[in-house]
């Protein structure tokens, strides 16, 4: 990436610096093209600035294109060891390691018999296969990487004279993939780029890995999930949808397909939390898309779908900040998000516009009798102020707020 088009992502760099030189493998995991490789490049520059000699930083990329004939864990181990010429510490920055069969074995050996500090990236479930628990139990930290936050998006657009609220409209429509954000693509071109990313994920990380034979049925399941972002649904609902189209798929296969999409970081599951019983419920979850542009590249932009994508933005902003995020169930009422981080908790309702009688929108929050922060987040330009302890906040302000 050209230097002038590259924006620092200090939150990720700070996390890597925090774990530097600890005897843990640092795993950066997220959907393809979300910026993991660039974060590694930036961290390499940070290491050099801190005084690490460049010849003690080993950067290797293991893409499927570069490993046409595959690579074994032994070949990976030997290849890295050959580059280590003394007993001083080496910093290993290894990109897309899941393309190496049994990469965990090689990494474990390098941890045990070499003076190393190891950082790896990956884009799919092969990164986190069952064998990682056999070889790296308690010896790795997983760092989720997401597409650009709105704050990061604004850094990409620093030369743009438009207001943050105007830029938010672009962010909603175009999403946060860095390759799109760093250039001024027209909408159609942006969606073509995102469609290419999506197809790469589906082909490389899902259909090929899991040997999906009936691609049409799989794509129909994906379509259902994308159309129902931010809505509770079940595998049975998907089965009924397929039946209405004259298709049939077992509940088990539907669960498998959803799992594959999760493991490729295309969708994220948001469970329900019973605020009365203080327990996580196992039914009627919601799913959110890794980036809003994934919906629009498949379905086209539809203003009617903006409300659900606003939820999508808030969900990932909370995830980026380290919250565990749930749908809140308070007897018969629903809270869009209950976000928990250590002993902190916040409640968030999301709506496109404030209704004339805003009490109706606030009711679900006002019925909560604890003293945790409560927000209604909206695109309404009149948002602002406080109603009985509930803060009314414009989406642009909520997404860039320093703290909640």
Describe each region flagged by the PLM.
Residues 123-125, 129-232, 265-268:
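Interdomain motor-coupling "hinge/lid" segment immediately C-terminal to the ATP-binding subdomain
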Residues 59-88:
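Short glycine-rich substrate-engagement loop in P-loop NTPases that contacts/grips substrate
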Residues 185-344:
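Accessory nucleic acid-recognition modules appended to NTPase machines
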Residues 3-21:
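Pre-Walker A adenine-sensing motif
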């Amino acid at each position: 990436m050209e230097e002038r088009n590259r924006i620092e992502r200090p939150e990720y760099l700070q996390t890597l610096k925090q774990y530097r030189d600890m005897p843990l493998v640092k795993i950066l995991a997220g959907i393809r093209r979300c910026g993991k490789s660039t974060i590694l490049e930036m961290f390499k520059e940070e290491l050099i600035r801190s005084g690490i000699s460049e010849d003690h930083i080993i950067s290797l990329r293991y893409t499927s294109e570069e490993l046409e004939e595959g690579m074994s864990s032994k070949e990976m181990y030997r290849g890295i060891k050959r580059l280590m010429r003394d007993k001083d510490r080496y910093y290993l920055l290894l990109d897309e390691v899941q393309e190496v069969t049994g990469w965990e074995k090689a990494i474990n050996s390098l941890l045990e018999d070499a003076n190393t500090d190891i950082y790896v990236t990956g884009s799919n479930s092969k990164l986190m296969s069952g064998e990682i628990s056999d070889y790296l139990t308690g010896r790795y930290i997983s760092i989720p990487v997401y597409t650009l936050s709105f704050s990061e998006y604004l850094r990409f657009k620093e030369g743009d004279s438009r207001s943050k609220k105007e830029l938010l409209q672009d962010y909603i429509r175009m999403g946060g993939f860095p390759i799109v954000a760093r250039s001024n693509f027209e909408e159609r071109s942006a969606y073509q780029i995102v469609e290419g990313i999506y197809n790469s994920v589906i082909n490389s990380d899902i259909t090929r890995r899991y040997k999906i034979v009936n691609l049409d049925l799989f794509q129909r399941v994906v379509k259902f999930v994308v159309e129902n972002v931010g809505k509770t649904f079940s595998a049975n609902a998907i089965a009924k949808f397929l039946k209405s189209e004259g298709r049939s798929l077992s509940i088990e296969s539907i669960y498998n397909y959803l799992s594959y999409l999760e493991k490729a970081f295309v969708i994220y599951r948001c469970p329900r939390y019973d605020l009365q019983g203080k327990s996580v419920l196992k039914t009627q979850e919601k799913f959110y898309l890794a980036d809003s542009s994934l919906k629009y590249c498949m379905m086209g932009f539809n203003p009617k779908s903006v409300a659900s994508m606003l939820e999508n933005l808030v969900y990932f902003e909370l995830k980026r900040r380290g919250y565990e995020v749930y749908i809140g169930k308070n007897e018969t009422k629903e809270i869009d998000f209950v976000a928990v981080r250590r002993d902190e908790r916040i409640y968030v309702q999301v709506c496109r516009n404030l209704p004339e009688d805003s009490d109706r929108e606030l009711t679900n929050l006002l019925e909560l009798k604890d003293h945790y922060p409560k927000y209604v987040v909206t695109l309404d330009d009149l948002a602002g102020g406080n109603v009985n302890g509930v803060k009314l906040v414009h989406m642009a302000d909520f997404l860039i707020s320093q703290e909640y």
